A protein has these predicted regions:
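Generic structural signal for hydrophobic core residues of well-folded globular domains
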Residues: 55, 91, 106-107
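Amphipathic alpha-helical packing segments from all-alpha helical-bundle domains
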Residues: 64, 104-133
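Helix-turn-helix
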Residues: 8, 16-50, 54
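Hydrophobic alpha-helical connector segments
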Residues: 61, 65-100
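N-terminal intrinsically disordered/low-complexity leader segments
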Residues: 1-4
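Short amphipathic alpha-helical elements of helix-turn-helix/winged-helix folds
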Residues: 12-16, 90
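Alpha-helical DNA-contacting segments of helix-turn-helix folds
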Residues: 52-59, 66
Length: 134
């Protein structure tokens, strides 16, 4: 798929979710939003689930890229304090309605949840164990 069409499709999905909610994402809605044909969408995304998965991946990647920009590097290359600060700052700056809706939607779907959880595992501060005396 041409990168510009892929980006156009992902941006359309995000706009639809932001405006109308996740249930409004259909091939017809995405085709109308992008100006692409329904057949063109089906060629690259064989199911609605594939569209949704790609949108989740795109948003999770954007979130991680934002944290990398704030921290000045990837999670495994920066100090824990920089990682924590980037996580907190990005949560405050980047929590749009679409991210919140997509994260909530992923809660019962292991394939979707793992995309967001991977980012969280790399960036979020570890939760102290209640049994830890420190």
């Amino acid at each position: 798929m041409r990168t510009c069409n892929r980006r156009k499709i992902l941006d359309a999905i995000i706009a639809i979710v932001e405006r109308d909610g996740i249930t409004a994402v259909t091939f017809d809605a995405v085709a109308a939003e992008t100006g692409l044909t329904r057949g063109g969408l089906l060629y690259h995304f064989p199911s609605r689930e594939a569209l949704i998965l790609a949108a989740h991946q795109h948003l999770a990647d954007q979130w991680e890229a934002g944290m990398e920009k704030i921290a000045g590097g990837k999670a495994d290359t920066v100090e824990p304090a920089e990682r924590d600060a980037a996580y907190i700052q990005s949560c405050a700056q980047m929590a749009r309605r679409v991210e919140l809706l997509m994260m909530l939607e992923s809660a019962g779907e292991p394939d979707l949840d793992s995309l967001w959880q991977g980012v969280l595992d790399r960036w979020s501060p570890p939760v102290p164990d209640d049994d830890d005396p420190a």
